[in-house]
Design a protein with these regions (language model features):
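Cytoplasmic helix-loop-helix junction between adjacent transmembrane helices
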Residues: 191-226
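Cytoplasmic membrane-interface "Motif A"-like loop-to-helix N-cap segments
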Residues: 147-158, 368-382
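Helix-to-loop junctions at the C-terminal end of transmembrane segments
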Residues: 137-150, 359-372
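Extracytoplasmic gate region of multi-pass secondary transporters
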Residues: 100-101, 309-356, 457
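Symmetry-related core transmembrane helices of the 12-TM Major Facilitator Superfamily/SLC fold
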Residues: 257-276, 477-495
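C-terminal transmembrane helical hairpin of 12-TM major facilitator-type secondary transporters
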Residues: 374-425
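Glycine-rich segments within core transmembrane alpha-helices of 12-TM secondary carriers
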Residues: 218-244, 447-457
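Cytosolic juxtamembrane N-terminal segment immediately preceding the first transmembrane helix
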Residues: 2-8, 19, 26-95
Length: 532
């Protein structure tokens, strides 16, 4: 009897070993709760990774299906709707952030009623609110995005953005006579709108990982991040054209209301789109790394794991320099340009943003095809440093001819071309380095660190300008400091940036998994499905 039983068990074992892991139920099923219908369907849809198909998402997509051997991964058209929500949210929010930078005098008189006279003007306070809020709300955005899902994060981000835009619009109504009330409402609306950054700045990497296959992740990140400089371009060009002949008085008292009303309509569009997002993530994962990604590390532990990773800390510094040096320089540059005889309004910032958007798309395509993330970062840091040093040297002398503004535009375009691609590529590299830390957490740490630098650098520029060292024109030393910081980023990228691509290692490996080892992935664990 015992011999018969042993033969039966041996036969069962031989049959089980022939069943692919992707469809095999673990042997210890009788010791566990029975699989629900949802878990079973997810298991059968290819959420597991088997020995022969770890690198499934290396294959290009065909008709929405990514296949390799017995595992099937799938992409859905709805991914473009999810991406559009993030893109238009970023564009709208960036426009609200930068819209008053080129109108500092007009904004000062309309909202405060008197010149700044050495104090912080209204436009600078509005800009700094966005950086300050991004630092302190970023952790909440990271937690909600990773634990409540993309749909919830998108709804919260678009709601905060449209509410903030509405309050800013109310603040611009001419019937409000008190300048104190106007300025208070403006800053309150800016505070609420700035809170939306906590979501859309960490959503790109999450959307790319959960909805897009391996050969589209970098471009998905790029599209999300270039929406930000596109918003910056709109936020500088539109007010420069709209307020070209503006004079403070009754004749133009509705100009600010019309401008903020337009930004309100733009903020309302992504909110409507977010209402059509029906699920947190697709039923079938688009890639092997997405299928294997489990949220079982813990939020605090994930942050510590990022901060204690030396390579990630180097990437944090590079990302912070790229983000803060570019935008703080473009805001600061208005003074030196006027001092040297240029009358260019906000157009250098717009040129910087437009050129940076185009080069980011190119960099994203190259990254998707070659996976050379660190090489792109190195080229960008060197190019940015050369551009800012050249601009500093060129502005040493006042303008002397009609070609000088063209040179300034070219140099500003180079600043954007070499700095803006570092945002999406840097986030993608951060996810690779910290895998399997959840995407919103790793990208959120990068963004928070960048926002912190963006909050500090303008004060550093203002302080160094007030020191009046070495030069009769104090802004020259402030630009020298910017050049020095850009050189630090060059040294870090060339000699210390040596990341390990952990996510690609998972996707490319033909790992020697035991054929008897059960595999439970992110999509087969009910709790993790709920979290993501």
């Amino acid at each position: 009897m015992l011999l018969v039983l042993l033969r039966v068990l041996s036969w069962i074992r031989n049959v089980q070993d022939r069943i692919p892991i992707a469809v095999r139920i673990p042997r210890s099923w009788w010791l566990r709760k029975r699989l629900t219908q949802q878990e079973s369907s997810q298991l059968l849809m290819g959420s597991a990774i088997n020995k022969e198909a770890v690198a499934a998402d290396k294959e290009p997509t065909t008709n929405g299906v990514v296949t390799d051997h017995s595992v099937v991964y799938k992409v859905y058209p709805a991914r473009w709707l999810v991406l559009a929500v993030c893109c238009f949210l970023a564009l709208s929010n960036a426009m609200q952030w930068i819209s008053f930078s080129s109108l500092s005098d007009e904004v000062q008189m309309y909202y405060r009623g008197r010149p700044a006279n050495g104090s912080m003007d209204v436009s600078l306070v509005t800009n700094q609110i966005f950086q300050f809020v991004a630092v302190f709300t970023g952790f909440g955005g990271m937690y909600i995005t990773d634990n409540k899902g993309i749909k919830t994060a998108g709804l919260l981000g678009t709601s905060l953005n449209v509410i903030g835009a509405s309050i800013r619009m109310i603040a611009s109504i001419p019937f409000i006579e008190s300048h104190l009330v106007r300025e208070t409402l403006l800053h309150a609306g800016s505070f609420i709108a700035a809170s939306a950054q906590a979501f859309f700045l960490v959503l790109p990497s999450k959307i790319a990982e959960c909805w897009f296959p391996g050969d589209q992740r970098a471009i998905a990140n790029v599209l999300s991040f270039v929406a930000n400089p596109a918003g910056v371009a709109l936020g500088t060009i539109v007010p420069s054209v709209l307020f070209k002949n503006y004079t403070h008085g009754n004749a133009s008292r509705w100009m600010f209301f019309s401008f903020t009303l337009g930004m309100e309509f733009l903020a309302f569009f992504p909110f409507i789109l977010a209402l059509f997002v029906r699920s947190k993530l697709p039923p079938t994962p688009p890639s092997a790394s997405s299928a294997a990604h489990q949220n079982n590390i813990g939020f605090v532990k994930s942050i510590l794991q990022c901060l204690l990773n030396v390579q990630f800390f180097i990437q944090m510094t590079l990302f912070a320099f790229a983000f803060s040096l570019l935008w703080s320089l473009m805001i600061f540059l208005d003074g030196p340009l006027k001092d040297q005889g240029y009358n260019m309004a906000g157009y250098p910032t717009a040129v910087c943003a437009v050129v940076g958007t185009m080069t980011s798309l190119l960099a994203g395509h190259i990254a998707d095809k070659t996976r050379k993330f660190k090489e792109i970062i190195r080229v960008c840091t060197v190019g940015f440093s050369c551009s800012v040093i050249t601009l500093r040297m060129f502005l040493s002398e006042p303008t002397t001819g009609p070609l000088d503004p063209i040179v300034v535009y070219i140099l500003c375009g180079c600043l954007g071309a070499f700095s803006i691609p570092q945002f999406p590529i840097g986030v993608e590299l951060g996810v690779e380095t910290t895998f399997p830390v959840m995407e919103a957490t790793s990208s959120g740490v990068l963004v928070i660190f960048g926002s912190l630098f963006m909050f500090i650098i303008p004060f550093v520029q203002t302080y160094t300008e007030s020191m009046r060292l070495f030069y009769a024109q104090s802004w020259k030393f402030a630009l020298d400091v910017t050049c020095g910081l850009s050189l630090i980023s060059v040294v870090l990228s060339l000699f210390f940036l040596k990341p390990r691509y952990r996510r690609l290692e998972l996707e490319n490996a033909k790992s020697a998994l035991s054929p008897e080892e059960p595999v439970v992935t992110a999509r087969t664990a009910a709790s993790d499905i709920e979290m993501r």
